């Protein structure tokens, strides 16, 4: 009776909730409690290691989290490859075979392109690594969020070690950022990226708030929105034309940088070990690795 009364969206919601319930109830409670505790400790160790530039602080926690994740996921889908289960949880219908085929195709074109571009060294401009007051960077963040359409009445902004976006409903979407005193571009593009996530969440139909349909069900879709704002819009010179003068008022070092020089810098391609700071080209290489 109830099934006949549900439309397609609510049938999907019920089906997804039952699937998640069936998976999660298979996990022993004591194991999951230990997993959550380990994750919290791992997060603290990661932050300490990051600030100390000492991977050895985090290494044992990383090993422990990998092993515990295998145990937990092994219970959710018994008999299924653990990594296939993890992929499917992020992107329903995805598996290792599909990813391997896709990555092989991308790698064939991408690696020669990266080598070709990075062989031509682009001169460093110290202006982009000059001191930038964190309060000024916060004001720049709001300039950018307002500019791209983030709704202040349905969101908030905070600070964390690693930028992220989370939502509790379409009317409560929270963005975080991190401000490096000598890397203002980092916070600027994090603001645009996370703003892309947030705008997506703020425009979900409020009828589905607090349901699995009230947030994007596929990570690929969500990340496509954030990276569209960050790269397709944010690295285009036309994006900056209406606000570049205001940027110079907030961060005076940019007053002496032409818009064309700014565009070249924000489209710089170079190898990096940090995914979130990687450029549009080498970012994919880090994902592939």
What positions do the PLM features span?
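Post-HExxH zinc-binding segment in Zn-dependent metallohydrolases
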Residues: 216-253
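Conserved small/polar residues in nucleotide/adenosyl-binding loops
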Residues: 1-5, 287-289
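Short acidic (Asp/Glu) and glycine-rich catalytic loops that position anionic groups and cofactors
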Residues: 120, 171, 203-210, 265-274, ...
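Active-site recognition of the HExxH zinc-binding catalytic motif
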Residues: 189-202, 226-227
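Noncatalytic, helix-rich "gating/capping" subdomain that lines the substrate-entry/channel surface
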Residues: 3-59
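Long, amphipathic alpha-helical stalk/connector segments used for oligomerization, subunit docking
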Residues: 238-287
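Post-HEXXH active-site segment of zinc metalloproteases
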Residues: 201-224
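Contiguous, non-catalytic segments that form substrate-binding/exosite surfaces or channel walls
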Residues: 35-186
